[in-house]
Swiss-Prot record:
Binding site for Mg(2+): E189, D241
Traits of the deletion mutant: Plants show a semi-sterile phenotype and a drastic decrease of meiotic recombination, indicating that SPO11-2 and SPO11-3 are not functionally redundant. SPO11-1 and SPO11-2 are both required for double-strand breaks induction. Drastic decrease in chiasma formation at metaphase I associated with an absence of synapsis in prophase, due to the inability to make double-strand breaks (DSB).
Localization: Nucleus
Domain Topo IIA-type catalytic as annotated: residue spans: 8-142
Family: Belongs to the TOP6A family.
Cell wall biogenesis/degradation found in the keyword field: no
Annotated protein name in UniProt: Meiotic recombination protein SPO11-1
Subunit (UniProt): Heterotetramer of 2 SPO11 (SPO11-1 and/or SPO11-2) and 2 MTOPVIB chains. Interacts with MTOPVIB. May form a heterodimer with SPO11-2. Interacts with PRD1. Does not interact with TOP6B.
InterPro entries: Meiotic_Spo11, Spo11/TopoVI_A, Spo11/TopoVI_A_N, Spo11/TopoVI_A_sf, TOPRIM_Topo6A/Spo11, WH-like_DNA-bd_sf
One example of a Gene Ontology biological process annotation: meiotic DNA double-strand break formation
Broad enzyme group: isomerase
Length: 362
C-alpha cells in the first residue's frame, strides 16, 4: 500500500479516524449496532493445483463485525481502544511499538496477539501501512557494507567501516540520502553467519551490502530491504539454513507473511534469489555426516505443508523441488556446517562461487 498513503497525510488519516469513531458513537446513541467490515487478505493458499488469485493484492473475502455476538463485541472494543491510542500518537507526532501499546492497557488486551490483530484490522480498515499509524517495530536487524544513509537526521556511514554492524533503522520511512557502491545485497538468516562474514572482512573484498534479521525478520528489516531494492536496483541473494525454518524465513522475505498479507507490496522482496544452503550442498561440499541432522516429525509436517503453497508451483518450481529433495533425504543442516573444513570457507569460497554462478547464469 506504499504510495497510497504518505506520512505527510497524517492529517487526512486523523480526520478519517475521527469520522469513523463519530459514526460508531452515533450508531450507539441511536440504538443501532455498529457494523464494521474488514477485508481479508492472503498471499497464498494450500492448493498448488488451484487457479487462484493469491498473487494479487485484492481482498479475498470480508468479515463483518457487529455487537450481536460477544467475540465480535470484544474485537470491536479492542479495535477502538487501539485506534484511540493511534489517534493520540498521530496528534502528538510520536511513535510507539506494539509492545508499548499493549502495556497501556494490559488487563484489557490480555495478550500481545490481541493488539497485533487490532493493528492489522486498523491498517485494513483505513487502507494504510503500520508506519502510517506511527506504530513501529523494535528493530532486530543489522546491516554492514557499501552503504550510507540518513534516518530522522541520524547519519549511518557503513562505508566508513565496511565490516562494522549497524542497526537497521526503525523509522524506515524517514530514511533518505541513500548512497551505495555495492554490486549486490546479501541477506543472511543468522547473526552468527553475519558476524563470521564481518570477522572475515567479507565486505572489504566483496562490494556488497549484508543484512541479517537475526532469525525471522521483523517489519523494519523487511521494509528496509524493500527500500534498498527500490532505490538501488541491486540483485538480492539470501543465505539460510537447509531446514524448514530457514526456508520459511526465505519465503517470508520473498513472498511476505500471511499475518501481514494486507501490506505485502511494501514488505516483500519479489526478485530475491535463494543462494543456499541447498540439500545437494551437503554432497557437493562434503559436509560430514555428523553435521547432518535427521528431520523431526514436526520438520516433515512443516515441509509437507509448505509444499502445498500455491506460489511455489506457480512462481518458484525449482524451490519446490529443493524442498522435496530435503524431505526425501530426511536430513537438514546449518549454514555453519559448510565451514567444517575452514572457518573462512563461507566468505572465501562458498558465497563468492555462488554469486559468480548467479551472475553468469542467463
Amino acid at each position: 500500500m506504499e504510495g497510497k498513503f504518505a506520512i505527510s497525510e497524517s492529517t487526512n488519516l486523523l480526520q478519517r479516524i475521527k469520522d469513523f469513531t463519530q459514526s460508531v458513537v452515533v450508531d450507539l446513541a441511536e440504538g443501532r449496532s455498529p457494523k464494521i467490515s474488514i477485508n481479508q487478505f492472503r498471499n497464498y493458499c494450500m492448493n498448488p493445483e488451484a487457479d487462484c488469485l493469491c498473487s494479487s493484492d485484492k481482498p479475498k473475502g470480508q468479515e463483518i463485525f457487529t455487537l450481536k455476538k460477544e467475540p465480535q463485541t470484544y474485537r470491536i472494543d479492542m479495535l477502538l481502544r487501539v485506534l484511540l491510542i493511534v489517534q493520540q500518537l498521530l496528534q502528538e507526532n510520536r511513535h510507539a511499538s506494539k509492545r508499548d501499546i499493549y502495556y497501556m492497557h494490559p488487563s484489557a488486551f490480555k495478550a500481545q496477539s490481541i493488539v497485533d490483530r487490532a493493528i492489522g484490522d486498523i491498517c485494513i480498515l483505513f487502507q494504510c501501512s503500520r508506519y502510517n499509524l506511527n506504530v513501529v517495530s523494535v528493530g532486530n536487524g543489522l546491516v554492514m557494507g557499501w552503504l550510507k544513509f540518513r534516518e530522522a537526521g541520524r547519519k549511518f556511514d557503513c562505508l566508513n567501516s565496511l565490516n562494522t554492524a549497524y542497526p537497521v533503522p526503525v523509522l524506515v520511512e524517514e530514511v533518505e540520502d541513500i548512497v551505495s557502491l555495492a554490486e549486490y545485497i546479501l541477506v543472511v538468516e543468522k547473526e552468527t553467519v553475519f558476524q563470521r562474514l564481518a570477522n572475515d572482512m567479507f565486505c572489504k573484498t566483496n562490494r556488497c551490502i549484508v543484512i541479517t534479521g537475526r532469525g525471522y525478520p521483523d517489519v523494519s528489516t523487511r521494509r528496509f530491504l524493500r527500500l534498498l531494492m527500490e532505490k538501488l536496483h541491486l540483485p538480492v541473494h539470501c543465505l539460510v539454513d537447509c531446514d524448514p525454518y530457514g526456508f520459511e524465513i526465505l519465503a517470508t522475505y520473498r513472498f511476505g507473511s500471511m499475518q501481514m498479507a494486507y501490506d505485502i507490496e511494501s514488505l516483500r522482496a519479489p526478485d530475491m534469489k535463494w543462494l543456499g544452503a541447498f540439500p545437494s550442498d551437503s554432497e557437493v561440499y562434503s559436509v560430514p555426516k555428523q553435521c547432518l541432522l535427521p528431520l523431526t516429525e514436526e520438520d516433515k509436517k512443516r515441509t509437507e505443508a509448505m509444499l502445498l503453497r500455491c506460489y511455489l508451483k506457480r512462481e518458484m518450481p525449482q524451490w519446490r523441488l529443493e524442498l522435496e529433495t530435503m524431505l526425501k533425504r530426511g536430513v537438514k543442516f546449518e549454514i555453519e556446517a559448510l565451514s567444517v573444513h575452514s572457518l573462512s570457507f563461507l566468505s572465501e569460497v562458498y558465497i563468492p562461487s555462488k554469486i559468480r554462478r548467479e551472475v553468469s547464469s542467463p
